[in-house]
Design a protein with these regions (language model features):
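ATP-dependent carbohydrate kinase catalytic cores
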Residues: 112-130, 140-142
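ATP-binding/phosphotransfer module of carbohydrate and carboxylate kinases, centering on a glycine-rich
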Residues: 1-75, 85-88, 110-114, 131-137, ...
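Glycine-rich phosphate-binding loop of actin/hexokinase-like ATP-binding domains
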Residues: 137-192
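Short hydrophobic alpha-helix segments
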Residues: 39-42, 95, 162
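Hydrophobic "anchor" residues
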Residues: 36, 91, 158-159
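Short beta-strand segments
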Residues: 19, 75-81, 119, 141-147, ...
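A short acidic/small-residue loop/turn micro-motif
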Residues: 43-46, 99, 165-168
Length: 321
């Protein structure tokens, strides 16, 4: 990301954050106090050009909603799936968007003349979840959606690791004889608690397979009961790994599966409690008391992208007033 032709927008009142998903963009406008003053959703395009066009359209529409010209936007942050080079503003292998390699920040800056920063979507969501939850120390954001991944925030900053893969707990193999994962391994955490893997294992038609699984489990269906158990134990395994490896104080759980609400929360807590019964050490960690569920529809991912776009050098988290 060169940014050579982008004007200095320091001090401009509005920061924009975009959570770019496979089907939709969730966009928020954030004022200097940290309040969300506008929010909208737009359909995501497919392929390099369409993705850029849909991002530009979302920013312009959001500016209209807030009642400001696009020139009053100080920065735009984008959270997007795939392998992201945050320094270069490039995203690679965003397969659900039809993107193999895209110089996203440069393309968007050329279209709007506004500074753009790009970050992996789950890492951006971790920042947003930390800010919205008021966490000031260490936390992890565990995303339970079609896939499974985590973002880790230590002392207000994203922890990326040496090669940017910190938090990829979905591809930790916990059962070498388990189901085949899309990554090529067997028995990954994602095969237990990822929405896509659960829907595939369920194998029955329906618009909302995860809800169908839970409804069938309530009716005593053996396969559904087994898949619910897999979900709870897989998510519990991810929580254990995050706490034991990074010693985070809190694990905030988000993603599409949080629409299950208390059923998901209670099941994961029960699995954590049961898994610690035989170990005084694990009991001492009180893992079942260290998880929080984001409300369904939370703007955490887009809000975190706005923080990323702000290019805050000392702290990436700002208080949410």
């Amino acid at each position: 990301m060169t940014g050579a032709s982008v004007a200095d927008h320091t001090g401009r009142p509005i920061r924009v954050g975009l959570d770019v998903g496979g089907t939709k963009i969730d966009a928020v406008a954030v004022d200097p106090s940290g309040e969300i003053v506008g929010r909208l959703r737009r359909v995501t395009g497919w392929g390099d050009d369409a993705v850029v066009e849909s991002i530009v359209a979302a920013v312009s529409a959001l500016a209209d909603e807030v009642g400001l010209p696009s020139s009053d936007i100080g920065s735009v942050g984008i959270g997007i799936p795939g392998l992201v080079d945050a320094d270069a503003g490039r995203v690679d292998h965003a397969v659900n968007l039809g993107v193999e390699s895209l110089e996203l920040a440069d393309r968007a800056e050329q279209a709007l003349g506004i500074p753009f920063r790009v970050e992996n979507d789950v890492k951006a969501a971790a920042l947003g979840a930390a800010a919205l939850s008021g966490v000031t120390g260490s936390m992890a954001y565990l995303n339970l959606g079609t896939g499974v991944a985590a973002g880790i925030v230590i002392d207000g900053r994203i922890w990326r690791g040496s090669r940017g893969t910190a938090g990829e707990v979905g591809h930790l193999s916990v059962d070498p004889n388990g189901r085949l994962c899309g990554c090529g391994q067997h028995g990954c955490v994602e095969t237990f608690c990822g929405g896509g893997a659960l829907a595939k294992a369920w194998g029955r038609p329906g618009a909302l397979p995860i809800r169908d699984i839970f409804d069938a489990a309530d009716a005593g269906d053996p396969l559904a009961l087994a898949l619910c158990t897999d979900l709870f134990h897989g998510a519990a395994a991810a929580v254990r790994v995050l706490v034991l490896s990074a010693d985070v104080e809190t694990v905030v759980i988000g993603g599409g599966l949080t629409a299950l609400g208390d059923r998901l929360d209670g099941g994961i807590r029960a699995a954590l409690h049961a898994g610690a019964e035989a170990s005084p050490f694990m009991r001492s960690l009180r893992l079942d008391e260290r998880i929080e569920l984001l409300p369904a529809g939370s703007p955490a991912a887009a809000f975190g992208a706005a923080l990323v776009g702000a290019s805050i050098t000392e702290k990436e988290i700002v208080p949410h007033g």
